């Protein structure tokens, strides 16, 4: 590809598909000087394993590095020097790369009479045997059981494929080895940003009608007072029994480390409240005394115990919004329509608040709004919610234009 770009003096590169390969290709094109890069994705966001909130961080990072990101639009036709989209839009191109997903290559298996499943992948048992017990299969073309859903899924990732190869070798050699359910743990680099996930996304849980709860939080990559600390956004999905259903993270340092810990916790059946007790490595350059994984456990535990009711960006319609930060912070920026009551003033001003209307409290990342909600709950309010991850997540989503601008317009006072 680099040789072609050099020989043809190409200036316009288009990548079709926003999966991991498409995102990595777009980044590589964008890093080449003089090449304008466009990524086209038919879905509403890139990176299918994660939800829109997590993908928003990747969208903003790609735009920051000059990539023209086109979402919810599909390619309908290739011309000699332009690509036509379903919206009618036309994009010039000198080189195009199709990164539109993978389909299992099972022609050999089908020719041998081996059974395939709903997804088109080869059906195997826990020993990686196909419907012909003398033939084994592994890798991108096989169906495996999903850890959370229990359904047969395709997991086109190198880690599971390597483990399956070892299991097949063991069984051929007479050592009984089995493949466990797959979490689909994955990570991708998006310029300076890292996106990682394990387990199910919220979109998957909704499609499968699996009951769930969720929360968002921000955690520092290491102790905030140690130089170079950056924030990571975490999205945790769990159920009322405390089972961890999925984790997603977006940040610049230590992202995959925390998701790996969460994946190991899921694999070993830990409940969300047991995350609180995990003893993880700590020194100021590497983490905080309460690691983000511990904090995630505390967030979920507080929700399950009824200490706090979380609210999310999609809940702000028809709610009274209270910015509980200082007046200076409020005047610098806030959510459109919010009223300012500083947390220390709540004990005196709580009588101003209605008890018959939903109240959403928010701060920068969610900690102070939790404290404020406890103050009100202890005064008999049962209509009080804390905006998960606060105005920091809100601003990232507004930047990505995920919500109607009228509802979420940032207003300097």
Predicted regions and their residues:
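FAD-site-proximal beta/loop scaffold in flavoenzymes
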Residues: 1-8, 81-84, 90-167, 261, ...
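Rossmann-like dinucleotide-binding cores of NAD(P)H-dependent redox enzymes
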Residues: 12-14, 20-77, 157-160, 179-203, ...
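Residue-level detector of alpha-helix initiation sites
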Residues: 20-21, 45, 103, 152, ...
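Short loop/edge segments at beta-strand edges and connector loops
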Residues: 71-73, 79, 118, 216, ...
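Mid-to-C-terminal Rossmann-like scaffold of FAD/NAD(P)H-dependent oxidoreductases
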Residues: 141-252, 284, 288, 292-319
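A short, polar/charged loop-to-alpha-helix boundary motif
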Residues: 253-272
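Rhodanese-like catalytic fold shared by cysteine-dependent sulfurtransferases
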Residues: 273-320, 326-360, 364-413
């Amino acid at each position: 590809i680099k040789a072609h770009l050099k020989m043809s003096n190409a200036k316009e590169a288009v990548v079709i598909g926003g999966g991991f390969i498409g995102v990595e290709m777009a980044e590589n094109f964008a890093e080449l000087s003089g090449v304008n890069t466009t990524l086209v994705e038919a879905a509403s966001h890139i990176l299918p394993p994660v939800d829109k909130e997590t993908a928003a961080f990747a969208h903003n990072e790609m735009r920051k590095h000059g990539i023209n990101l086109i979402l919810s639009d599909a390619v309908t036709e290739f011309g000699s020097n332009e690509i036509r989209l379903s919206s009618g839009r036309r994009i010039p191109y000198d080189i195009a790369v199709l990164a539109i997903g993978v389909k299992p290559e099972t022609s050999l298996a089908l020719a041998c009479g081996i059974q395939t499943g709903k997804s088109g992948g080869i059906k195997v048992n826990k020993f990686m045997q196909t419907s012909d017990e003398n033939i084994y299969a592994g890798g991108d073309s096989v169906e495996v059981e999903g850890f959370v859903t229990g359904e047969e899924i395709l997991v086109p990732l190198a880690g599971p494929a390597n483990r399956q190869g070892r299991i097949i070798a063991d069984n051929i050699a007479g050592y009984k080895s089995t493949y466990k359910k797959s979490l689909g743990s994955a990570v991708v680099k998006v310029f300076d940003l890292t996106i990682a996930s394990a387990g199910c996304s919220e979109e998957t849980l909704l499609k499968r009608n699996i009951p769930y709860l969720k929360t968002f939080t921000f955690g520092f990559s290491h102790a905030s007072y140690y130089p170079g600390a950056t924030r990571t956004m975490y999205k945790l999905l769990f159920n009322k029994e405390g089972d961890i259903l999925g984790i997603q993270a977006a940040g610049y340092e230590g992202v995959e480390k925390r998701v790996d810990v969460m994946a190991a916790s899921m694999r070993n059946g830990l409940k969300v409240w047991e995350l609180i007790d995990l003893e993880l490595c700590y020194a100021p350059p590497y983490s905080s005394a309460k690691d983000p994984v511990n904090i995630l456990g505390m967030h979920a535990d507080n929700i399950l115990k009824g200490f706090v009711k979380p609210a999310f960006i999609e809940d702000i319609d028809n709610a009274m919004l209270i910015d509980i930060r200082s007046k200076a912070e409020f005047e610098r920026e806030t959510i459109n329509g919010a009223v300012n009551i500083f947390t220390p003033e709540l004990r005196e001003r709580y009588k101003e608040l209605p008890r018959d209307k939903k109240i959403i409290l928010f701060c920068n990342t969610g900690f102070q709004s939790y404290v404020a909600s406890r103050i009100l709950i202890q005064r008999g309010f049962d209509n009080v919610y804390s905006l998960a991850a606060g105005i920091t997540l809100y601003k990232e989503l507004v930047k990505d234009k995920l919500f109607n601008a009228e509802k979420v317009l940032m207003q300097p006072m």
